[in-house]
Amino acid sequence: MTSAEIRQQFLDFFASKGHQIVPSAPIVNKNDPTLMFTNAGMNQFKDYFLGNETPKYRRIADTQKCLRVSGKHNDLEEVGIDTYHHTMFEMLGNWSFGDYFKEEAIAWSWELLTSVYKLPKDRLYVTIFEGDDKEKLARDTEAYNFWKKWIAEDRILLGNKKDNFWEMGEQGPCGPCSEIHVDLRTDEEVKAVDGKTLVNNDHPQVVEIWNNVFIQFNRKADGSLEELPDKHVDTGMGFERLCMAIQKKKSNYDTDVFTPMIDFVAKAAGIKYGADEKTDIAMRVMADHIRAISFVIADGQLPSNNKAGYVIRRILRRAVRYAYTFLNLKEPFLYKLVAVLADQLAHVFPELKSQQDFVAKVVQEEEISFLRTLDIGLSKLEQIREELKAKKATTIDGKTAFELYDTFGFPLDLIQLIARENGLTVDEAGFDTEMAAQKQRSKKAASVETSDWTIVTEDDEVEFVGYDHLISTSRIIKYRQVKTKGKDQYQLVLDTTPFYAESGGQAGDTGTLVQGDKKIKVLNTVKENNLIIHITEQLPADLKAPVDCKVNVLQRSLTENNHSATHLLHAALKQVLGSHVNQKGSLVNESVLRFDFSHFSKVTEEELKKVELIVNEKIRENISLNERRNVPIEEAKKLGAMALFGEKYGEYVRMITFDDSFSRELCGGTHVSSTGKIGFFKITSESSVAAGVRRIEALTATAAEVFVDEQQTTLAKITELMKNPKDLVKSLEDLLEERIVLQKQLDEYQAEKSKAIAKSLKDTVEKVGDINVIRAKLVLPSVDAMRQVAYDLKQTVDNLLLVLAVNVDGKPNIAVMISDNLVADKGLNASQMIRELSKEIQGGGGGQPFYATAGGKELNGLDKVIAKSKDLIQVHA
């Protein structure tokens, strides 16, 4: 049975049991601040469990893309090393929202595994929750009794809170669970060791394949548990492990889920899979990691240095390093796997196939970037290893590890991995200290304390009326206090609200809540777990009395101008650049619009003019808004409505159209009633955001007019300064050409002067052993001149160690130059020396082992630099 057949049989089975089959939610979690990625099938249904939303279907089944590489669920270190951990995996799941409970869930899981998939009954074990005295939770005897109907009692095992009480995080839905394990060992191995002793003991052939979670509780912020109003079933079955069991393989990687990619890598590397453990691990890492990388990018998250973007960059760099070190793949290669994966899963996850070229381009650019520093970084690690060996030490200190991270782009887990391969450890606490210090310097550290919700009225229905009204009378459903950077704020949920919550790139509304003669400012409106949350600094005096909601009309109007303009811009870009253009992100507020889109080259000035012209034509046409709500998603797609990759859409959507033949998008934001209200559209910048992603920033209405006026004023001033020439452009070109000639003459003069200075400094050489030391304090016109002097001396003086303390326009600068042979043979390091010397000028800097520079604030410290350098040279030499 192929993996595709196994997946389809699961969905067909639960469809026959009255379940609605729904698509996977995006792997990038945009609606839950507690999660960066979807790490379980239940994430998209969290609000059903909490009672925030009423499910349309009581029974649901799906296959969900999941990622577990951060926080509590972090399997990254094991991925590729063993045969069953993965970064990205599919979770098959069936759900009951206040419908069936333990009896049916247990019976159906047994029926599917034994009657449909034909797994041998004598190879299955189940676990149930044994209870927990500390939590005052009793044993799950219900589950035990239901299991007795299907399986021998000696195969029903008791599990502790760690294994058999499921929690998504520190807060949220939870409950006892019942796991199903399968024993895949040989008959001889089964006879030798009883399988029940290996359950939940990390045996690679005795593994959990299905978990039935019986959601009964909610974990509150104070750690206590409260009963949920309705009982639910949340099951999750690891698709890859299930395939291993059914296809009778010893490893997930031996199934047809992974073999197409492993075979592709093996062929490219010219190495047979199974020939060597190290190369096998590398191939498994690449086959696994490309799945996580591809789906995260396809669902809208690009690699970056922050949060979710950095998680995916870490995974990508881990894969590149394995390919580089163990498979001798020194050029970008990982991106070629995107096509293999996209073809394999086109029938179940079409979003990857439709973005195949874009995803591959992003991966390729990331590979190119990391490969530039990978070789240098690995050489640095080898140098560190040799230094530790000489000292008979085995720990890479935190400061050194942080330098590898900060300078060479090595994630901590990659440093730890390479260290382990060489019998070393990393001072993680020291690394964390360095990281914390950097965050403090960057003022990025922030703390947020959130209290539990206080219920005011028992009402879980929240209605947004802001498409039609900017004023409403509402009641508070619940509120909570939030402390951010020592400042108290409140979050309010109202039964009816005209305030638009920040989502889809559109900023949230501001305004006021009025009760009697008291006005409370609404500072922002956000969405969390599909709740519309109003942020204020105060609470109304009477929490149970109605409040009058009033949206800031001017802000909303300006924001609508910008949002509708992005729709026109999107359509115009497709018209000018091609159908490959897709939105990759946006920001619209009352001041500006920012639009990110897929395109592989800079948009030319001519193309930008065409785009502007089209948008302004559509504004002048004063096209009326055609808004349709509750359109069936399939109907909207047939009509050609543009949907955004990575967004989760329900069965019914809102469709925004400006001219049936021009712009039709799925959108939940607010818009102008007709395009004429936008007034005027002006692009202010076009730039690159990431590989294959461009960004346009623009203004509309009065802001656009002000921008054009300012440009006109600037042009008039330049014309006046140039003495009002007939041809301003020609005059500027002549002036720039003259400047180039003068600059060239100046550079030639400076080069000669630098050589003369270098020649005079040769006479000041001090011998320290076999090292020729030059230490000098100079006044130079530029940092480039300092560099020129240093390189001139390097070319003419052997065994050189040079320290320059230079006054550049009243600012202190330092340079350290060391001959290559001294770096290689004696381990001298200019970067390390510069860090010590820069303290004397209250500055900082860095560079390479042979040349490093620093700038600072304290000009009087240059004499101290020269004095201190003498002591440093004595120590290092």
UniProtKB/Swiss-Prot annotation:
Binding site for Zn(2+): H563, H567, C667, H671
GO CC terms of this entry: cytoplasm
Cofactor note: Binds 1 zinc ion per subunit.
EC number: 6.1.1.7
Cofactor names: Zn(2+)
Reactions it catalyzes: tRNA(Ala) + L-alanine + ATP = L-alanyl-tRNA(Ala) + AMP + diphosphate
Class of enzymatic activity (EC top level): ligase
Subcellular location(s) of the protein: Cytoplasm
Keyword terms of this UniProt record: Aminoacyl-tRNA synthetase, ATP-binding, Cytoplasm, Ligase, Metal-binding, Nucleotide-binding, Protein biosynthesis, RNA-binding, tRNA-binding, Zinc
GO biological process terms held by the UniProt record: alanyl-tRNA aminoacylation
Listed GO MF terms: alanine-tRNA ligase activity; aminoacyl-tRNA deacylase activity; ATP binding; tRNA binding; zinc ion binding
Annotated family: Belongs to the class-II aminoacyl-tRNA synthetase family.
Function: Catalyzes the attachment of alanine to tRNA(Ala) in a two-step reaction: alanine is first activated by ATP to form Ala-AMP and then transferred to the acceptor end of tRNA(Ala). Also edits incorrectly charged Ser-tRNA(Ala) and Gly-tRNA(Ala) via its editing domain.
Record remark on domains: Consists of three domains; the N-terminal catalytic domain, the editing domain and the C-terminal C-Ala domain. The editing domain removes incorrectly charged amino acids, while the C-Ala domain, along with tRNA(Ala), serves as a bridge to cooperatively bring together the editing and aminoacylation centers thus stimulating deacylation of misacylated tRNAs.
Protein name: Alanine--tRNA ligase
Gene: alaS
